[in-house]
């Protein structure tokens, strides 16, 4: 199929799938240059002069990534009139590679949510394994991205992953979701939720497509202070022996770790079945399976929901309606500036954002910071230590372990990657999530991140790949798709992608 015909198909699918609400600003409603861009890419292809493997491909962007030609709203009333004067670095990199912006996708407001229902533009709907009367959760916060990819409204999509916001939607929609190591991809032009956790991630239908996007974006950006420098990238490559990755995979079987703490009682039978099938398949391929203990996992989720809201409460203080965004028009002669500020923020932010701002402000308060924020930072360091102790490869940017005996033991018994479920259950229905009679709905949504948060706290690369399983009714394999997560040592992104491809071939 020519790139132009492919582009026309994506635009048609955006129009026919409007009810899914995957896009806030779809290309079909935005007069752009996509037709000419796709035609030009076709010409370059016939001449053998494609700019990259993504030339002429439709890439959708989560609506918290700044684009010059499309509004950037973060799915919030506070930014519903905002258009950035510049492109984010990742947008510019993809446009330079010939990719076409396919539109801006829906999300939980400012990236805060697990089901893509906290958007001022309405819920994102997922129809996988459901009929139109029972829409399923698309996961969050990058649910619009995942649904757009799953329903062929774009070739791939770029979003953000703070505690699982790429991987959870991938698991719920049967797509591939890749979160690279923290700092490899530029965050310049990405509207922040939690700076120390936010990572630009990729959603696609195949691991190979996610790799193509990653290869274009995996570059140092001097404008982003969290971007890994060229010297550090060289150190990562040298320490992890990345140039010899193929020989690493063929010289010996992989040692694959099963995190014991991820085998929880709440794990759905279909998810457990998919996990077991994946491990058995890898064992049949000659790889070694061994249990691994990550004792701080049980505290990771609590630490995350202290740290992320704390950073968010600081980041979102800038939205006052003065410099940009929506400003409250409720004005009287006697009102103070403080009243206007409070009124603007009260009207502009949704309930989940307000909840997390309050949580974050409390954990940073003088009476709570020692017992909450400081303790959460300590737990975060211990979570990373758990991973470092489990992996055979030493963290390439961390201080070297001085205990030679411990390092030798890790080299002999350490694992190459961890494999776990991405989410403990299949996607719930939208009606179940929004049922006001269910008092635990907010807490349940937080618990959905239990398997994805640890890798985020440690800044590790992780990918979610769809794998077949069975449900409670005994439906045949293939009826249920569960997300299986592969986690690697920091900087070992290529190995994570390779193992993801192994699972994809299953």
Swiss-Prot record:
InterPro entries: Amidase (IPR000120), Amidase_CS (IPR020556), Amidase_dom (IPR023631), AS_sf (IPR036928), GatA (IPR004412)
Localization in the cell: Mitochondrion
GO biological process: glutaminyl-tRNAGln biosynthesis via transamidation; mitochondrial translation
GO cellular component: glutamyl-tRNA(Gln) amidotransferase complex; mitochondrion
Entry EC no(s): 6.3.5.7
Primary localisation category: mitochondrion
Catalytic activity: L-glutamyl-tRNA(Gln) + L-glutamine + ATP + H2O = L-glutaminyl-tRNA(Gln) + L-glutamate + ADP + phosphate + H(+)
Keywords, sorted A to Z: ATP-binding, Ligase, Mitochondrion, Nucleotide-binding, Protein biosynthesis
Sample GO molecular function, one term: ATP binding
Ranges that cross the membrane: none
Pfam families: Amidase
Positions of the catalytic residues: 62, 141, 165
PANTHER family xrefs: GLUTAMYL-TRNA(GLN) AMIDOTRANSFERASE SUBUNIT A, MITOCHONDRIAL, TRANSAMIDASE
Function as written in the Swiss-Prot or TrEMBL entry: Allows the formation of correctly charged Gln-tRNA(Gln) through the transamidation of misacylated Glu-tRNA(Gln) in the mitochondria. The reaction takes place in the presence of glutamine and ATP through an activated gamma-phospho-Glu-tRNA(Gln).
Subunit annotation: Subunit of the heterotrimeric GatCAB amidotransferase (AdT) complex, composed of A, B and C subunits.
Family: Belongs to the amidase family. GatA subfamily.
Protein name: Glutamyl-tRNA(Gln) amidotransferase subunit A, mitochondrial
Record lineage: Eukaryota, Fungi, Dikarya, Ascomycota, Pezizomycotina
């Amino acid at each position: 199929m020519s790139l132009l015909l492919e582009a026309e198909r994506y635009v048609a699918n955006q129009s026919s799938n409007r009810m899914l609400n995957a896009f806030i600003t779809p290309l079909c409603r935005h007069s752009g240059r996509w037709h000419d861009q796709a035609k030009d890419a076709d010409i370059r292809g016939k001449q053998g002069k494609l700019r990259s493997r993504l030339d002429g491909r439709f890439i959708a962007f989560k609506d918290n990534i700044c684009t010059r030609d499309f509004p950037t709203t973060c799915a919030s009333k506070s930014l519903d009139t905002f258009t950035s004067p510049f492109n984010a670095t990742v947008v510019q990199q993809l446009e330079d590679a010939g990719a076409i912006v396919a539109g801006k996708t829906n999300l939980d407001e400012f990236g805060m949510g697990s089901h893509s229902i906290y958007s001022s533009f309405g819920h994102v709907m997922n129809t996988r394994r459901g009929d139109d009367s029972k829409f399923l959760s698309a996961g969050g916060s990058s649910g619009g991205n995942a649904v757009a990819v799953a329903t062929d409204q774009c070739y791939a999509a770029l979003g953000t992953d703070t505690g699982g916001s790429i991987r959870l939607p991938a698991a719920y929609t049967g797509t591939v979701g890749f979160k690279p190591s923290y700092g490899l991809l530029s965050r310049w032009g990405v509207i922040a939720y939690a700076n120390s956790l936010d990572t630009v991630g990729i959603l696609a239908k195949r691991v190979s497509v996610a790799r193509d996007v990653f290869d274009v974006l995996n570059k140092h950006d001097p404008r982003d202070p969290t971007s890994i420098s060229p010297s550090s990238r060289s150190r990562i490559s040298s320490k992890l022996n990345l140039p010899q990755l193929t020989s690493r995979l063929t010289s010996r079987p992989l040692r694959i770790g099963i995190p014991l703490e991820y085998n929880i009682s709440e794990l759905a039978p279909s998810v457990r079945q998919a996990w077991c099938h994946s491990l058995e398949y890898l064992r049949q391929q000659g790889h070694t399976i061994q249990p691994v203990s990550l004792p701080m996992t049980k505290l990771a989720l609590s630490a995350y929901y202290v740290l992320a809201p704390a950073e968010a409460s600081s980041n979102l203080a800038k939205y006052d309606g003065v410099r940009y965004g929506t400003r409250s028009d409720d004005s009287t002669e006697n009102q103070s500036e403080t009243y206007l500020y409070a009124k603007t923020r009260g009207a502009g932010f949704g309930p989940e954002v307000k909840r997390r701002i309050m949580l974050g402000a409390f954990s940073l308060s003088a009476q709570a910071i020692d017992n909450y924020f400081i303790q959460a930072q300590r737990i975060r360091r211990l979570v990373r230590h758990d991973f470092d102790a489990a992996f055979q490869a030493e963290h390439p940017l961390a201080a070297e372990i001085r205990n030679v005996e411990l390092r030798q033991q890790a080299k002999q018994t350490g694992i190459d990657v961890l494999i776990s479920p991405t989410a403990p259950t299949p996607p719930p229905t939208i009606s179940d999530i929004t049922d006001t009679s269910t008092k635990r709905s907010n807490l349940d949504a937080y618990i959905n991140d239990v398997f994805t948060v640890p890798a985020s706290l440690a800044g590790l690369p992780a990918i979610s790949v769809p794998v077949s399983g069975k449900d409670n009714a005994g439906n045949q394999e293939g009826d249920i798709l569960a997300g299986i997560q592969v986690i690697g040592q920091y900087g070992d992104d290529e190995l994570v992608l390779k193992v993801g491809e192994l699972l994809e071939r299953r």
